């Protein structure tokens, strides 16, 4: 829900239904895998269908499982009758796969393949990773807090606030910089001592 809501908003629609009425389909491109975990992509598509998100399609760069391959997704969107397509990465970070495999100008990019099919009036790309969505960030924070509590042997239902999390990250970064600076200083001192001894 968070993922689709963000894509819909970024495309300028009030909701998924308004996009559907305008003939717009959203295609989320994940990585894919040959591992048995690939079933999660099929399950995600089934979940979208169950939610009534008829204009949401799940694909993968690796094309595994098969129904998530670019050609299969193009066919599914075409058969569903949508004329506008919005491509968006289903990845935490919008890196090489998003910029090149999805939105690149090469003929094998998803954007190029959708355009080359001749079935769509427009193909737009949203270059934004899941990690940019506040609600997804909170899921990571919650899971991290739960893992820390489990490792610490404590059970807690209280989750750090966004402010506390930001403070902790800032402190950790400062400590890391201080450690790195100290380490560099020690290395310089050791080199100076070595020169002095020689």
Outline where the language-model segments fall.
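Small/flexible residues
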Residues: 33, 196-197
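Intrinsically disordered, low-complexity serine/threonine-rich repeat tracts
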Residues: 156-196
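Extended amphipathic ligand-handling, pore-lining, and cofactor/metal-binding catalytic surfaces
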Residues: 1-155
């Amino acid at each position: 829900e968070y993922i689709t809501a963000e894509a819909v908003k970024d495309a300028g629609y009030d909701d998924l239904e308004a996009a559907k009425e305008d003939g717009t389909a959203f295609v989320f491109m994940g990585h894919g895998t040959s591992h048995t975990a690939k079933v999660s992509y099929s399950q995600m598509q089934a979940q979208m269908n169950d939610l009534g998100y008829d204009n949401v399609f799940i694909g993968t760069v690796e094309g595994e499982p098969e129904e998530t391959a670019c050609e299969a997704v193009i066919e599914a969107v075409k058969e569903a009758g949508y004329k506008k397509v919005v491509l968006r990465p289903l990845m935490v970070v919008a890196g090489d796969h998003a910029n090149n495999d999805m939105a690149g100008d090469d003929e094998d990019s998803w954007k190029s393949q959708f355009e080359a099919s001749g079935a769509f009036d427009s193909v737009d790309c949203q270059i934004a990773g899941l990690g940019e969505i506040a609600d997804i960030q909170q899921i990571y924070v919650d899971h991290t807090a739960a893992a820390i509590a489990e490792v610490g042997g404590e059970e807690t239902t209280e989750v750090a606030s966004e402010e506390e999390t930001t403070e902790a990250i800032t402190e950790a970064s400062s400590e890391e910089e201080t450690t790195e600076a100290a380490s560099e200083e020690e290395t310089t001192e050791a080199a100076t001592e070595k020169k002095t001894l020689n």
